[in-house]
Every structure is written in C-alpha cells, then in structure tokens.
A protein has these predicted regions:
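Catalytic domains of carbohydrate-active enzymes, especially glycoside hydrolases
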Residues: 52-81, 168-172, 352-363, 425-431
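Aromatic- and acid-rich polysaccharide-binding/catalytic face
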Residues: 218-224, 274-309
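Aromatic-lined carbohydrate-recognition surfaces of secreted/lumenal glycan-active proteins
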Residues: 37-49, 109-113, 175-178, 231-273, ...
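Mature N-terminal, pre-catalytic/accessory segment of carbohydrate-active enzymes
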Residues: 28-111, 157, 250-252, 400-404, ...
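Active-site-adjacent "subsite" loops/lids of carbohydrate-active enzymes
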Residues: 110-169, 210-233
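Carbohydrate-binding surfaces of carbohydrate-active enzymes
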Residues: 253, 257-259, 297-568
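The substrate-binding groove and active-site-proximal loops of carbohydrate-active enzymes
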Residues: 41-51, 76-89, 141-157, 225-241, ...
Length: 568
C-alpha cells in the first residue's frame, strides 16, 4: 500500500476552507485484495470481556460455539484512567486472546475507548487513580471530573504511553472511540458552548489570538462575533486532532502494519471534525483508514424502525463526506445500550446490519454483548448464536454487492424518516451514494399512506413512479417494506434486497426484474436465518424477467442473488 500524501498545512486554514475541499465523489471501487483482507462482521467488546482470565474464558467459550458470528473482535482499552501498569497487564491478556482468536479464524483489533472520556454519568471513582490533570470544563465553568482536558501535558503523555502499550498487540486496526469530541461531556457541556474552557485551553487560545481571554469575556464576545466562534471551533478541533495524531504516531512506531480508525456520530455538523481526524490518521499511518458512523436507536422497545433509518443515516453521511478514497471501511454502529437481555434482539441487529450493507456500508460493527451481568449461556443463546445463524446471508450479500451501487429516489431534505416511509411502499429509495432516479420533494414523498389506503392505490403509485423513472425492479404484489436494487456499472441487475416492514410474514411477492441478462438461469432467494430457495425465472414475450419470492418472514430481510457468486 503506497503512502498517502495529505495536506499538513495549518489546521486553522484547513477548517476555515473546509467547504472548498468538501467535494463529493463517487464511491471508490477497492481492489479485490483490499476487500478480501477486510473483515466484514466485527464484534466489539468492553474491557470487562478480557480483563481477567475468567472473563475471557467465558467469552471465548461463546466464540468457540459460534465462530461464524464474526470475522474480527475489538478488544477495549477501557473507559477509565488507571495506572499504566494496569494497561500493561491488560495488553498481555489481549495478546493471549489474540492467539485464541487466531485459532478460530477470527482477527483482532483494539478500541481506544477512552480519550477525552464519555461523561460523569458513565463513571464511578474506581479506576481513575492515574488522573492528575483537570477535567473537561464547559463555558459555564462546570467541570466533568471523569473527562479530560485535551491539552494538558500530563494527559497527553498518558495517552502517548497508553497507545504505545496497546500497539504491542499488533492489531489489524486501532479504533478511536467517539468520546474524542468537543461536546457531550456531561455535566460540563450542559448549557455550554463547544470545547474545553479550562485555564489551560483558555491560555493556549489567548496565545494564538494575542489577546488575553477569560471564560466570561470570551463567552460574551462570541455572542456577537461569529468569526471568533469559528476560530474557537477550529482551535477545539485542533485539540482533538492532536490526540488522534499522538495515538497514530505511537501505534505506527510499534506496529507499522496497523491501520487506524475513528468512531463518530453522523450528523452533518460532524463532517468537518470527522474529515480532519480521518485525514490525520491516514497521513500519519500512511494507510487508508476506517470509519464507523453512528448514534442512537439502541433499543428494540422504542426503536425498531429507527434502527433501519439509522443505517440510512449512515449511508447519507457517506454522501455528505463525499466518500473520500482515504477511507477504506465504512461500518455502521450496530449497538445496544445497556447490553442486557431486554434491550435488544439479535433479529434487530441483523436487520440494521443488512440495511447498512444494502445502502453502501462494507462492514458491520456490533456492540451487543453484556459485561457479565447476564450469563454467558444467555448471551450465547439469545444474541451470539442467532447472529451467527444470519451471518452467512450477510457475508453473501456483501460479496454479491461488490462493485455495485444502489438505485432509488433521493429526498430533498436531510431527514431520512420520510424517505423510509416512502420506501416502505416497495419503491426504491436512495439515502446515500448510488444511482439516483430523481430527487423528490416532501410533498412527493407522501403520495399515499401505506397504512390507510388499499393495496391497489399503493400499486398505482408504484406504476406512476416507475413511469417517471424506470427502476431495475418493479414490485407487483401487496408488500410493505423496503426494496433495494443494486446494479453493476453497466446497469446490470446484481441483487435485490427486501426488508419486510410488517410484524407478519408477507408473500408471495412478484417482482419484475429489468436489466437481467438473457443467459441468467439462476436466481436464489437468501433470507436471514432461513434456508435458501431457488426461484424460477419467467420471461414474457419481450424477454422481461419475473420471479416470485415465496415469503419474507416477519420483520426480516433477504436478497435475490442473481447468477452464481463465487466466494474465496
């Protein structure tokens, strides 16, 4: 892999001119070798999964039962600031764990789960013995004691030493968690402007501004000076960038083959900091980097449809970012919090993962196992086993989608909820990268209520949209759910994803398949946690192909695999 040449000018200039270089580009088609080396299904662990021999033995026993559940495990550095000797001992545990995983054919990455810190509500005093520096402080003067000022030398030295220790594991990727952010560090950030407002940060900013600022004078001045607020934001992002740079430098010094990754939310306002961090990681490591967009929708009780929209939001953020070539892996955050039995089901994990792959993600990050408040037997039976049961379909789907793009109608706004509702009519929609059939207004996205109109009215809308912009696939049966065609560069239909939006089985579902080569004889329906079904292709007098999917299970998904897909 050649080293990437990225700009290393003053970050201040980069941030102020970010709108200039934030150009959209098409989804890069990676070399086959690059794709083959990348893990698809990644299982994130907490530190408690590997901090003792007993805990690791419990987790390893589950993975031995269901090794197909994942291609890679992320070990965690933890979310506290213990003495470095504690980290050193954990590194030795990780090394032994990595050897255990290798025997199962599972790779290893490391997640730096604490840089700035997540917030005081997430922590107790235990485990913070090494913290001798000030916490993150808001513009109101409130300090988050279990978070860290990003510029204090003692903290940066600690991060440097910690990163060098964990690099000894020689992981595939070092992932920096989403606490590397300039907001959401409770209670400091409540009713606060962004950034850390401690004495250290205020002095550093004052030195750059050649003017002495206090917390009160800076806050007051920002109220009427947007350029000052912009410079403060650039300063705050630079604070984060330096931390990412240190971690990447220390990792490369010990393990130059290791890649770097970043986890961050996918709201539009995040695009600048995400781009700056990822560019820094790519420049320092000399390799393409990995990115995990995410945020919210952690429970089944309230969020089953939100989990689908969340993957659509991740796809949309890929488009907002312009899908830069220095990012190799896009993996949605499929997460449960808390990770208890009642929080989330394996079925919803699989559906969110499937949706991410349908709309352009090329990997899946799953954080769904508990820290041993639930028994290993329950976690194996209720989560890891069912995920393993659906893993083959996810792998086949990702493989079949290589070098393809999704096709559908775009939305003219930044909210994917109307697009999702419209998509449940069985009309292809496109939240992210892909081949657009046109952009619809909000009024056009609400032509009929799928819940209050007969199926004949829904079918008329499908026909009208198809006449407006013919899709590679037209649904001809009563169906409530997403329909996602993916095509090759020449327009040839490659896969058709279906996600049943009802809590009952649907089918049969008759589909008209356009752009299907005349020599294609094999179409296989592959549904999550079901046996594959070979489908008969019918052709009319014009050679247009039709198939009938016999059924799609309640709140389940699957795809039509067109032709034979060879897998290494």
């Amino acid at each position: 892999m050649k080293h990437l040449s990225l700009p290393n000018d003053s970050l201040r200039n980069v941030l102020l001119l970010s709108a200039v270089f934030c150009t959209l580009c098409s989804l890069p088609v990676h070399a086959e070798s690059d794709v083959d080396e990348a893990p698809l299904l990644m299982l994130r662990f907490s530190k408690e999964h590997s901090d003792t021999e007993e805990h690791w033995a419990n987790m390893l026993s589950i993975l031995r039962q269901y090794p197909e559940c994942c291609d890679e495990v992320w070990f965690s550095t933890g979310t506290t600031v213990p003495p470095l000797e504690v980290h050193a001992a954990h590194v030795e545990m990780m090394k032994r764990g990595k050897a255990d995983l290798q025997r199962l054919g599972i790779g290893t990455s490391v997640q730096v789960q604490m840089t700035i810190g997540h917030g005081d509500s997430s922590h107790t005093p235990a485990g913070w013995e090494a913290k001798t520096w000030t916490g993150w402080t808001g513009s109101t003067g409130v300090e988050a004691r279990y978070c860290n000022c990003p510029r204090q030398p003692e903290f940066l030295n600690y991060i440097r030493a910690m990163a060098r220790l964990y690099a000894e594991v020689h992981p595939r990727t070092v992932w920096i968690d989403d606490d590397l952010r300039y907001d959401n560090h409770y209670p400091a950030t409540r009713d606060s402007r962004l950034g850390c407002w401690c004495a250290t940060c205020l002095k550093a900013f004052s030195d750059e501004e050649h003017r002495m600022w206090t917390r009160e004078t800076l806050d007051q001045a920002m109220a009427s000076d947007p350029q000052l607020a912009t410079r403060w934001k650039a300063f705050s992002i630079e604070s984060l960038r330096r931390i990412a740079e240190i971690i990447a430098q220390e990792t490369k010094a010990v393990s130059p083959e290791t890649r770097m990754g970043y986890q961050k939310t996918f709201w539009d306002e995040d695009s600048t900091v995400v781009r700056v961090i990822l560019q820094t990681l790519a420049r320092v490591s000399g390799q393409r980097v990995d990115y995990r967009p995410g945020g919210s929708a952690y429970y089944d009780r309230k969020h089953p449809a939100e989990q689908i929209v969340k993957s659509m939001d991740a796809a949309r953020f890929m488009r907002v970012m312009g899908c830069p070539d220095y990012v190799a892996t896009w993996c949605p955050e499929v997460e449960s919090w808390p990770r208890h039995y009642g929080s989330r089901t394996a079925q919803s994990v699989l559906l969110e993962a499937f949706t991410g792959l349908a709309y352009g993600m090329n990997a899946v990050s799953m954080y769904v196992t508990d820290r041993w408040e639930e028994t290993p037997e329950l976690q194996a039976r209720s989560m890891i086993g069912p995920v393993a049961d659906g893993a083959d379909v996810l792998r086949r789907y990702a493989h079949a989608n290589r070098a393809t793009e999704a096709v559908g109608f775009r939305c003219d706004g930044d909210d994917n909820h109307p697009l999702y509702e419209f998509g449940t009519l069985g009309i292809p929609v496109l939240p992210g990268m892909g081949r657009s059939l046109g952009t619809l207004t909000r009024d056009e996205l609400s032509p009929v209520s799928i819940y209050g109109e007969p199926s004949s009215a829904v079918q008329r809308v499908r026909q009208q949209m198809d006449e407006r912009a013919p899709s590679p696939v037209l649904c001809l049966s009563p169906y409530v759910g997403l329909l996602i065609p993916r095509v090759l560069a020449d327009g040839t239909l490659r896969t058709v994803g279906l996600l049943n939006g009802r809590i009952d089985t649907q089918g049969p579902i008759r589909l008209c398949l356009r752009s299907l080569p005349s020599d294609v004889q094999k179409v296989t329906w592959r549904e999550l946690r079901r046996r594959p079904v070979r489908l008969k292709i019918e052709r009319d007098e014009d050679g247009v192909a039709y198939v009938s999917v016999p059924s799609v299970g309640a709140w389940n998904a699957g795809f039509l695999e067109i032709g034979t897909v060879s897998r290494k």
